[in-house]
């Protein structure tokens, strides 16, 4: 009964990125620009890939799915932050907080596993080109995407259920602009030892794709450096450079946030979360399209179709 009453009456206060009103105004304007750019950029990538038959291959199928996840990922937190700032409110219900946390964990994990699938795709294309179409068949690609979604949601569910069982009887100010598991655990007045262990287990599951990416690129570069011509090296960097940039941005900020003790977390760390929740999803379409002739050509065709119609 107490837990049911808590879920219906408890509200959290989202302190924002810095907790300072002047700086929050700056981040409001920043997010007001970032969010539509993220939506439009990633949606254009999806439409360009779907509309151009030349891009109907595993590499671009995975890229289109990454763009879809980035749209959902940024939509979990930014609209709520913008709405709260506009309404002069910082509150979020207990149910809304758990929902936000669930989708952030699920989509964050899904994103990381799709990035691993993309690295595997490049490794197969460069190290086993004759078997590429067999290994990266349409069925295999669908299984890779489906598996990414299943693992992402399977990792998010236990964390959400465990957090829902906690009691919050004191300070209800969340040191972030959205409901993240780390500040929520710090607010609880329950015994959180098991929850912290589960959180680090989740971090371990989140690290598996990074290990897969590292192994894939070791395979890529070991194959490329065996090629006597420098063209092989340049081709590898041209096809893998964009992906490596995205992986570095994403995992660099996430590792800075979660690969450390819970007690070290503070409101100052909320600035780090802006990078992987807002900035990285916005930059991904530019990173993948600016250095990719096929994507740029598909985007031009897409715009020409819209103009001519």
UniProtKB/Swiss-Prot annotation:
Annotated transmembrane regions: 26-49, 58-79, 101-120, 140-158, 196-218, 236-258, 271-290
A GO-annotated cellular component: plasma membrane
Positions on the Cytoplasmic side per record topology: 50-57, 121-139, 219-235, 291-309
Pfam families in alphabetical order: 7tm_4
Disulfide bonds: 97-189
UniProt entry keywords in alphabetical sequence: Cell membrane, Disulfide bond, G-protein coupled receptor, Glycoprotein, Membrane, Olfaction, Receptor, Sensory transduction, Transducer, Transmembrane, Transmembrane helix
Carbohydrate attachment residues: 5, 264
PROSITE patterns per UniProt: G_PROTEIN_RECEP_F1_2
Gene Ontology terms, MF aspect: G protein-coupled receptor activity; olfactory receptor activity
Extracellular membrane side: 1-25, 80-100, 159-195, 259-270
Localization (cell): Cell membrane
Keyword Hydrolase: no
Domain of life: Eukaryota
Bilayer topology term: Multi-pass membrane protein
GO process annotations (BP): signal transduction
Family listed: Belongs to the G-protein coupled receptor 1 family.
Function: Odorant receptor.
Protein name: Olfactory receptor 1A1
High-level lineage: Eukaryota, Metazoa, Chordata, Craniata, Vertebrata
Gene: OR1A1
